[in-house]
Design a protein with these regions (language model features):
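Phosphate- and divalent-cation-binding pockets in alpha/beta enzyme and binding domains
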Residues: 36-37
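Hinge/beta->alpha junction and helix N-cap segments in small-molecule ligand-binding domains
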Residues: 1-12, 29-33, 55-57, 76-80
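Hinge/cleft segment of the Venus flytrap/periplasmic-binding protein
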Residues: 76-122
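Short, well-structured alpha-helical segments in soluble
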Residues: 9-23
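Venus flytrap/periplasmic-binding-protein-like
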Residues: 29-32, 42-70, 110
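Local beta-strand N-terminus motif with an aromatic residue
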Residues: 23-24, 69
Length: 122
């Protein structure tokens, strides 16, 4: 879906997609707009489609609670940004060798645990 599309454009594209591909039952969104598809599935009563999305934003959480999104991957953006700048500082300014890969935590949110999620700085 285009980033700057309207709800009507999204609805038309999704309706065409699901009409042409009726056997699709699992979807993933690779951005914070899983709610666009979640809202569409609720409005069109397509309960057989499961969505995995990214980012704990308000609209995604609402769709998760309503069941149109199966689960969300919550990332810790503050920690990711801090660790990136810290690694850059150590490499460029302090001339230290840094790890080429730095793993960051994620959390899987479901309708059952979303109300207990607390975004914290780890």
């Amino acid at each position: 879906l285009p980033i700057d599309g309207t709800r009507q454009q999204y609805d038309n594209m999704l309706e065409q997609f699901f009409t042409e591909h009726p056997n699709i039952h699992h979807c993933i969104t690779l951005g914070s707009k899983a709610h666009v598809m979640g809202d569409f599935l609720l409005r069109t009563n397509r309960r057989e489609v499961q969505i995995m999305g990214y980012d704990m934003v308000k609209k995604n959480a609402e769709c998760l609670r309503q069941g149109s999104i199966s689960f969300l991957i919550a990332q810790h953006a503050y920690q990711q940004g801090y660790c990136s700048v810290d690694a850059l500082f150590k490499a460029v300014v302090l001339k230290k060798k840094i790890q080429p890969v730095n793993y960051m935590p994620i959390e899987l949110l479901t309708p059952e645990n979303v109300n207990f999620y607390r975004r914290t700085q780890l």
